[in-house]
Amino acid sequence: MLLLRRLNRVRIASPYSVRLLSVKPISNVDDAKFRSQEEEDQSSYDQKTVCEALTCYSNDWQKALEFFNWVERESGFRHTTETFNRVIDILGKYFEFEISWALINRMIGNTESVPNHVTFRIVFKRYVTAHLVQEAIDAYDKLDDFNLRDETSFYNLVDALCEHKHVVEAEELCFGKNVIGNGFSVSNTKIHNLILRGWSKLGWWGKCKEYWKKMDTEGVTKDLFSYSIYMDIMCKSGKPWKAVKLYKEMKSRRMKLDVVAYNTVIRAIGASQGVEFGIRVFREMRERGCEPNVATHNTIIKLLCEDGRMRDAYRMLDEMPKRGCQPDSITYMCLFSRLEKPSEILSLFGRMIRSGVRPKMDTYVMLMRKFERWGFLQPVLYVWKTMKESGDTPDSAAYNAVIDALIQKGMLDMAREYEEEMIERGLSPRRRPELVEKSLDETLVCRE
């Protein structure tokens, strides 16, 4: 990306500094050419481009913050609420909450970057992910200062707690002794749906069943989302036939299913009765005017792959763009998981890149691990190179995958280089006896 290449011209003075230093061209001619190019390039600094560039640094908060400040200072780009939200999300991922709040305070007073519900949904999510539940609740209490302490923000807080396995605290917050005074009712279907999904996230299937019955006892109206959540619970708890039974109950009640509900039904019927029955529901939803989305196609492709019908899975992949539904990284991962020949995987990986589908870090790691298990080093290094050239910052799992592949081939020096790079980035490598023993041997040689 142009922005990422331009950023390579600058340096950070220290690990804790975000001041950016420009490199001056030597000659006046080059200087004029550089300024002309810069003025021309600035037209491409739109919100979408900046957000995409920040995403590339999602595994390196210092570089993300450096880029965030650089694009504003060097090009005059005015950050929007979305670009602020993106960098705040990255900072929160690494527990840099003090800097996050400093940025939120910067957003105030600027009409282009006013904090919104998404801003604080991110804050709640990152606090709860770090198991800082009280801090998340305190953040909600501060929302009066932003005119955002409302029903939407409360739902976002409860959703964050339930999503990240703090459902006990969420239930206490809504129905316990220390209920927050909000001025609105929390005994509604939406709150109960969030908590039901929270128990599902914990995998407490007995509690899910108990809570499902409790909703009936307390007279809570079950809507489409309630049924979709409980069907998903039945699938995950190994009882897809019960999800199919719920589907039939929904049809008897003349409930109009949406794409999310249909996706769950297809998965349930496919698992309990076979992929052909899943395809029948796929056709049914289209006949009823509910257009399948990417997740629907991914579900069918996964079922086909699990059934060993790779040709049909590839045919579905080919048809997706014709139906106005572009494949995503999950689509390709469904196929990668079932392919057993390195040449087929590399061919599909090349197709993925050429089609403009950006692999997720999980995709890179999955492929490197697969090649490592088969004892192929070159494909591992090729995937690593592609990842770096795409501007994606490797995480711990990616580093560990390439290090393990190098150790497997006895390339300990190169493995140690990657391990040192990990440490420099603040990532913790796994303890590997091979590398520890080598370090001790080198120390003894130096002493002799």
Swiss-Prot record:
Q: What ranges cover the PPR repeats? A: 80-110, 116-146, 150-186, 188-222, 223-257, 258-292, 293-327, 331-359, 360-394, 395-429
By what name is this protein known?
Answer: Pentatricopeptide repeat-containing protein At1g80550, mitochondrial
Q: Which InterPro entries match?
A: Pentatricopeptide_rpt, TPR-like_helical_dom_sf
Q: Does the keyword Iron-sulfur apply?
A: no
Q: Where is the transit peptide?
A: 1-21
Keyword Acetylation assigned: no
Subcellular localization(s) per the UniProt record: Mitochondrion
Q: Which UniProt keywords apply?
A: Mitochondrion, Repeat, Transit peptide
Can you quote a single GO CC term?
mitochondrion
Q: Which family does it belong to?
A: Belongs to the PPR family. P subfamily.
Q: Which Pfam families match?
A: PPR (PF01535), PPR_2 (PF13041)
